[in-house]
Amino acid sequence: MIILVISWGFDYVVAKFGMYDLTPTSLLFVRIAAGTVIVGIIKVIRRDWSLIDKRDIPVLIACAIFGQILYFECEYNAMTYLPVSLLTIVLGFVPAFSVIIERVFFKRRANRKIVFGILFCIIGIAFVIGADFSIILEGRLVGYLIAFGAIICWNVYNFLTASLEKYDPISLAFWQLLCASVLISPIAIHNMIPPTQWSGSLWLIILYMGVISSAYGYMVIVYALKVIGPTPSAVYSDFMPVTAAICGAVFLHESLSPLQIIGGIIVIAAGFVVIREKGNLMNSGRVCDIILSDKQHTLERKE
């Protein structure tokens, strides 16, 4: 997951360069299509011919829509309004939002530290946006709203994918990518310049995004969602602003104000506290389950 976070942090910079030649939708399509081919080859090499159950197809389609299409559509379009480093700080709210979803929809408990962590995440985001208030009316407000749309989409994807834990991660990643490729292809291909006109640098961008961002990325994230769950997986997004900020400064010559840097640190630190406490709650829950199971076995033996 750490390697994935670093590569996805650099992906923002790569995508921004890619959008000089392709529209966000077209870039997203070639990224997903390339990833589909690569994961498909891996699936064939493993001789994995497994399919998705008919009853799970609606969930699979929803995963493709929210995780592969809408999330990156929001992300890429937000880049046209916001610097990469600023965008990733806002997306650092993903873990806290994940805990909120768990509490509201799944009635999973949250202790005081988690609640305070979420509040500090919100404060950190307010610092980031507040420092940018002078130019919000110039269009950045739209960028922030689109970024929050990405946060919602990614959390929906995380919980939907976690519900399909019975499938092999590589197989599930392939079917999600294939489904997304089919869904987005009509619009993307219609508005895309012919591949014969692509520059050498654009081909390298597509290769990176297809191999690392899509193929490797989704195989890892699907596996992580299966093993450690949605909220623990989401915490790793808190470290993307660091990678993205460095890459943005080096390759795009972007900069952040002191207040935005402080806000970013608050978001990352608070998100880390949230996930650590969430992990403690999950571990204590597992211990309780083990104790109850042992007691049940003891009673059965006595009977």
Regions found by a protein language model. Name each.
Residues R31-A33, G130-A131, L202, D238-E303:
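C-terminal-most transmembrane helix of multi-pass membrane proteins
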Residues L28-V30, L86-F93, F159-S181, V211-V250:
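Helix-helix packing/entry segments at the starts of transmembrane helices
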Residues S26-I41, A62, K113-I123, V142-G149, ...:
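Hydrophobic alpha-helical transmembrane segments of multi-pass integral membrane proteins
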Residues G9, V13, G40, A64-I69, ...:
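Hydrophobic/small/kink-forming positions within alpha-helical transmembrane segments
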Residues V39, I61, G92-F93, A110-D132, ...:
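Hydrophobic transmembrane alpha-helices of multi-pass small-molecule transport proteins
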Residues M1-L28, S134-S163, V182, G285-E303:
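Glycine-/small-residue-enriched transmembrane alpha-helix faces in small-molecule transporters
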Residues S7, D11-Y12, K43-L91, F127, ...:
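Specific transmembrane alpha-helical segments of multi-pass solute transporters/efflux pumps
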Residues S26-V37, G67, F72-R109, I114, ...:
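Specific alpha-helical transmembrane segments that line the substrate/conduction pathway
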